Structures are given as structure tokens and as C-alpha cells.
């Protein structure tokens, strides 16, 4: 059955800034208050999309959120016109304005969890927007995320959309950053791998002590039920709490999977042997041959994995059957990581090539190649039903670069967030973007 994995990358929004909002994300916290360059950030992301498209990979784009979010500020007691709301928030509660101005939706691995039609009970592709309950600045994203996804995947014959889980800590859900899928071919029934950091209701599971575990077992189970997944096609695993406390805030910072391969750090999971055995068994029953590539801690320490974002990479299947690992520049700058990658590609394993991208603007906020994309496996007929306006092409790339040049600033500091003109600039840009991507009205300011 002919099917493709399509990577939908998040377009970096015009308010990209370094607010240091993400406790537990080492890069985000260490670069707090630095001056950002939204124009460069957006172009770095677009360059990656274009390069992968030109290599033959299916590539799409996911629109950013409208920021500053004046509706969120109003819900917190700020009143008056939009301009007055921003000025008052800047004067009285700058951290709230920074949170409501975050461009964190660029990391579309957190947008939703996606289950392909081959896995689901009703034979449709299922989407559940992530509630991102752990962080206020991200918890306000899911209503717009749901509207954008519905505008992209709008044929009910093929696509089913679910609202985010209840916005409470017991159902904390971070989307595809804690989810991957193994399969022989993208169109075959596969095994969906859900990784959680803690259990909300079962005290037998340990929890990290320093940083919060953002994903619960109960959220994973709820998404699997919503998507109509069978027990034979699901594996749940607990991430090692010790690595969460070292800055591994999502599982895609310590492992990445694709096809029949899991590329992971030795310390990524609890009960690793049991987890790998279950993946091997369940994928085998679905016609696949599971293979784990374990990176030993004595070659790459967890600290190096977090600094370089070795595992926050894209693992892509090439036409010849081998795999390509897309990594950030920071991997090349870390001798231990780069030596390991040189050894990896020299071995007779599935990962034969490494491609490096400069994503510094995103990386300084704690997001690498994997954070920037949402993977959707689609049959040919499903791909044909996707809104064509969001599928990357040479023409769309040129249009989006020109759009960025027209609307984005090349410098943004925290004090700039207090400028009401920024709100006007962002809304003007996004109103035009919805026309470019043929999304219709998806933003609150378009619906009011």
C-alpha cells in the first residue's frame, strides 16, 4: 500500500523571543532575556523545509499562533483596547505579557498526537491537540492548533479531530514529542509508542525530583482510546526520571524512532529491556523487524545529548532503504557527539547519512529539528485530501520567504513586546498568511 510520511514543520512566528519560560528546558532558561532575530529564525526553519523537500521528502508547513494573545491577557484581568491591554500588562506583569507573546507553537511536535489510518479502528487519521498543561504559555495554544489542523486536514472521510484532553495535571499531554510509531511500511498497521514521565493515579511509578514530568501515563492511555488503537498496536514506556532531572523534558530529547528503528540513549527509559522486548514482539506480529540502536552513556553522556540535541533529530527513510539523521549544528560542535555520529554512519547499520542544519534561533530556546516538525503518515488518497495550500513547494517557499521579509523584525527584545505596533504587525502578517496557505479564518482576531 503506497503511503508517505509527511513532515509538517512549524513556521516560526513574528514574536519569536527568548523569554526563558520553560522550566526544565536548559536551553530556554540559559538564554533568557537574550535578543532574538525572528526573521532569521523563520528563514532557518524554511531553509530546512526546502532542503528536505528538494531531497525528495514530503514536506508541509503549519502556521504559527497569533501573538500577543490579548484574549489570554483579558482572561487574567487586563481590560481596555488591545493596545491598552498590552501596555498595562507590560507595566504590571511583564512575565505574563512575555508568556502571551511566546512563539513556542513553532515546535509542532507538541501540537498534537497523530495516529495513521492503518492503526485506528475506523480507518481514519486521528488528531488530538495537546493540552500542554504544564506550561501556561503553551497551554493557551490548543484552541488555535485545533482550528489550524482542521483547516489543513478538513475532509471528514479521512480525518478525525479530537479536542485536547482535560486541562489538568493528571492528563498533562505534550503531543508527538512523547510519541513515535514503528512500522514495516508507512501504510501498514504499526505499533504506537507512548512515553510518559509519571502516573497521576498510580504511586508505584517513580517521578523526577527536580524538574516536572510533563506527560502522564493517563494522558497517553486516553489518547490511545480516542484514536481507537488496539492493545496489540500500543506500547507504553516510562522515561527515566533521572534524565528528566538532567533536562530531558520530552522524550524526543533522548530518543527518536522511524520505520523499524529506535535510536535511543542508554538511559532513556526505565525497564529498557522489557520495553524493547515488547516493541520487538508487537512489531513482529505486524510484519516488522524491530531494531534498537542504543547510544552508550560512556560515549555520549546525557549532558552532551541535551547540549547537542543529538536525539532531537529527524530520522528519515530514504528511497534506497537506508536512513538519514537530520541534526542541528550543535552536534557537529560537540566532539564526543560528532565522533559517535562518524562511527554510527560508518557501521553497517540503517543510519548511513547525517545532515546538519543551522537552527540556532530555535535551539537557543530549546528546540531542534524534531521539535519543529509534526509527522503524519498518509495514504495517497489521504495526502490528496490535505489542503494543498500547506504542502511545501519551490513556489510556496519563495512566497513565504518574501512574506517573512515584509513582515518580520530582525531584532526583538523583551521591551519590544510592550510595543502595541508589534501586535498590529503580527496580525497583518498572519491575516496575509492564512490567504497564502488557504486556511480560511483560524485566528481569534479573524473570528471576532
Curated annotation (Swiss-Prot):
Its UniProt pathway annotation is: Amino-acid degradation; L-arginine degradation via AST pathway; L-glutamate and succinate from L-arginine: step 2/5
Q: Which reaction does it catalyse?
A: N(2)-succinyl-L-arginine + 2 H2O + 2 H(+) = N(2)-succinyl-L-ornithine + 2 NH4(+) + CO2
One function term, GO molecular function aspect = N-succinylarginine dihydrolase activity
Q: What Gene Ontology biological process does one annotation of this record name? A: arginine catabolic process to succinate
Q: Which UniProt keywords apply?
A: Arginine metabolism, Hydrolase
The residues responsible for catalysis, as annotated, are 174, 250, 371
Subunit comment = Homodimer.
What's this protein's function? Catalyzes the hydrolysis of N(2)-succinylarginine into N(2)-succinylornithine, ammonia and CO(2).
The record's similarity note reads: Belongs to the succinylarginine dihydrolase family.
Q: What is this protein called?
A: N-succinylarginine dihydrolase
| Source organism phylogeny | Bacteria, Pseudomonadati, Pseudomonadota, Gammaproteobacteria, Pseudomonadales
This chain is encoded by the gene named astB
Amino acid at each position: 500500500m503506497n503511503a508517505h510520511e509527511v513532515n509538517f514543520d512549524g513556521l516560526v512566528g513574528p514574536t519569536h523571543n527568548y523569554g526563558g519560560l520553560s522550566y526544565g528546558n536548559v536551553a530556554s532558561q540559559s538564554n533568557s532575556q537574550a535578543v532574538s532575530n525572528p526573521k532569521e529564525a523563520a528563514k532557518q526553519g524554511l531553509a530546512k523545509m526546502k532542503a528536505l523537500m528538494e531531497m525528495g521528502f514530503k514536506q508541509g508547513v503549519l502556521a504559527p499562533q497569533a501573538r500577543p494573545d490579548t484574549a489570554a491577557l483579558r482572561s487574567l484581568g487586563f481590560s481596555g483596547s488591545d493596545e491598552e491591554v498590552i501596555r498595562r500588562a507590560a507595566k504590571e506583569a511583564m512575565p505574563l505579557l512575555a508568556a502571551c507573546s511566546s512563539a513556542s507553537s513553532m515546535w509542532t511536535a507538541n501540537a498534537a498526537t497523530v495516529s495513521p489510518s492503518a492503526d485506528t479502528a475506523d480507518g481514519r487519521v486521528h488528531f488530538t491537540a495537546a493540552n500542554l498543561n504544564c506550561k501556561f504559555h503553551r497551554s493557551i495554544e490548543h484552541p488555535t492548533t485545533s482550528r489550524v489542523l482542521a483547516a489543513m486536514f478538513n475532509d471528514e472521510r479521512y480525518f478525525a479531530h479530537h479536542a485536547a484532553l482535560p486541562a489538568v495535571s493528571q492528563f498533562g499531554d505534550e503531543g508527538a514529542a512523547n510519541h513515535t510509531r514503528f512500522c514495516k511500511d508507512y501504510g501498514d498497521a504499526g505499533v504506537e509508542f507512548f512515553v510518559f514521565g509519571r502516573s497521576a493515579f498510580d504511586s508505584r511509578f517513580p517521578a523526577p525530583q527536580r524538574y516536572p514530568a510533563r506527560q502522564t501515563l493517563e494522558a497517553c492511555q486516553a489518547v490511545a482510546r480516542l484514536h481507537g488503537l488496539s492493545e496489540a498496536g500500543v506500547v507504553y514506556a516510562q522515561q527515566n526520571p533521572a534524565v528528566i532531572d538532567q533536562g530531558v523534558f520530552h522524550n524526543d530529547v533522548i530518543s527518536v524512532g522511524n520505520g523499524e528503528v529506535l535510536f535511543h540513549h542508554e538511559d532513556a527509559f526505565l525497564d529498557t529491556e522489557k520495553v524493547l522486548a515488547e516493541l520487538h514482539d508487537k512489531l513482529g506480529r505486524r510484519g516488522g523487524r524491530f531494531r534498537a540502536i542504543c547510544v552508550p552513556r560512556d560515549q555520549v553522556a546525557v549532558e552532551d545529548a541535551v547540549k547537542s540535541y543529538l536525539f532531537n533529530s529527524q530520522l528519515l527513510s530514504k528511497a534506497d532503504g537506508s536512513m538519514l539523521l537530520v541534526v542541528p549544528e550543535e552536534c557537529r560542535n560537540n566532539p564526543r557527539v560528532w565522533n559517535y555520529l562518524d562511527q554510527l554512519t560508518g557501521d553497517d547499520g540503517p543510519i548511513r547519512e547525517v545532515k546538519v542544519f543551522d537552527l540556532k534561533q530555535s535551539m537557543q530556546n530549546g528546540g531542534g529539528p524534531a521539535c519543529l516538525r509534526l509527522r503524519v503518515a498518509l495514504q495517497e488518497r489521504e495526502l490528496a485530501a490535505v489542503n494543498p495550500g500547506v504542502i511545501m513547494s519551490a513556489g510556496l517557499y519563495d512566497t513565504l520567504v518574501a512574506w517573512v521579509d515584509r513582515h518580520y523584525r530582525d531584532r526583538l527584545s523583551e521591551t519590544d513586546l510592550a510595543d502595541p505596533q508589534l501586535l498590529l504587525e503580527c496580525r497583518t502578517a498572519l491575516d496575509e498568511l492564512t490567504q497564502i496557505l488557504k486556511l480560511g479564518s483560524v485566528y481569534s482576531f479573524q473570528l471576532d
